[in-house]
Amino acid sequence: VLTTVDALGFDRFSLVGHSLGGKVAMTVARSAPERLAHLVVVDVAPVAYTDRYTPLVESLRALPDDAGCSRAEIDRALAAQVADPNIRAFLLQNYRRTDAGWRWRMNLEALAEQMPVLMDYPAHGPVTLAAPATLIAGGPTGLVRSDADRQAFLEAFPHGHIVTLPHVGHWPHVEDPAAFRAALVSALA
């Protein structure tokens, strides 16, 4: 992230990260707090999580790599694992037709192999971040489920603020884009 913003010529920048991207954003805030104008973390806390994504990754890996499959067929196959059609549509944005057939743009094998590392969050203690820090949390089906998760964010970012969108889960930007946009605009104001 820092290499990219340096190449773009930004001294200070706002950083928004969802899920694993939120962990990356918190790590950037920890390593270069003076560079951030705003930090917005979406539905992930600075804690180690138990793995609940391997079944989803395995479901994605199990989808047919058949050039004859339509997007609708892939959507139907994925529906057994992901009931919400908006989330399926979001995931299917990463499923592309190539000359060799349908392929995932993300490296599912690497995700499956590295899941224990991705679920961890090894850094602890407060971050000396002068910039505003906001956690936009989903409701009970999101990753930020407990008071302990919220407290971990406030301990890491003592001047942090938490906004909860109780009617959405882990993908608030997909499940209720308008509410998410309002929370994000407020956090970046």
Question: What do the PLM-derived regions correspond to, one by one?
Answer:
Residues 26-31, 35-69:
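Flexible "cap/lid" loop of the alpha/beta hydrolase fold
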Residues 15-17, 42:
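Short beta-strand immediately N-terminal to the catalytic nucleophile in serine-hydrolase-like folds
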Residues 17, 21, 25:
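Gly/Ala-rich beta-loop-alpha elbow adjacent to hydrolase catalytic centers
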Residues 165-181:
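Catalytic histidine-centered segment of alpha/beta-hydrolase-like enzymes
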Residues 1-13:
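Conserved acidic catalytic loop of the alpha/beta-hydrolase fold
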Residues 51, 66-123:
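Conserved alpha/beta-hydrolase catalytic His-Asp/Glu region
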